[in-house]
Regions:
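Long, low-complexity or tandemly repetitive, helically biased scaffold regions used
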Residues: 2-133
Length: 133
């Protein structure tokens, strides 16, 4: 038995590739933030540094957003765009208002709040998989 991965309709191949190109900076954004969390051996990086990296990576994602916009994934695109805006706005508030989370739980909560809006990208990835048929 041969299992073949179905292909996307031709008109969605370029948008899907463009979407896939955004995943590395999106993953780096999340990894930057989680580097602030202290471990058993390391103290964790300063939030100001990791927040700056997070914002830089999300701006890279923002720059590539239009490349994957398509009527077939418009709802997902809009949700991702809103999620980016929300995450960047919260990061800006944290940076400019000098928000300092209290303790480990406060840091984890803040990181969760910053990452949650980006869950829309998971739903967009699922939609592209669904469109493969």
């Amino acid at each position: 038995m041969s299992l073949r991965r179905r292909r996307l309709p031709e008109h969605l191949e370029a948008p899907a590739r463009a979407f896939d190109d955004l995943l590395p900076p999106l993953e780096r954004a999340g990894a930057a933030l989680t580097a602030s969390v202290p471990g058993t051996r390391l103290p964790g990086r300063p939030l100001a540094e990791t927040l700056s990296e997070f914002e830089d990576e999300l701006r890279e994602v923002r720059d590539g957003m239009d490349d994957w916009r398509s009527p077939d994934v418009e709802l997902e695109w809009e949700a991702c765009s809103r999620g980016l805006d929300e995450a960047l706005a919260l990061a800006d508030r944290v940076r400019t208002e000098g928000v300092h989370p209290e303790g480990f739980e406060g840091l984890i909560g803040l990181i969760g709040d910053l990452l949650a809006p980006l869950d829309a990208f998971e739903r967009a990835a699922a939609r592209f998989r669904e469109l493969r048929g």
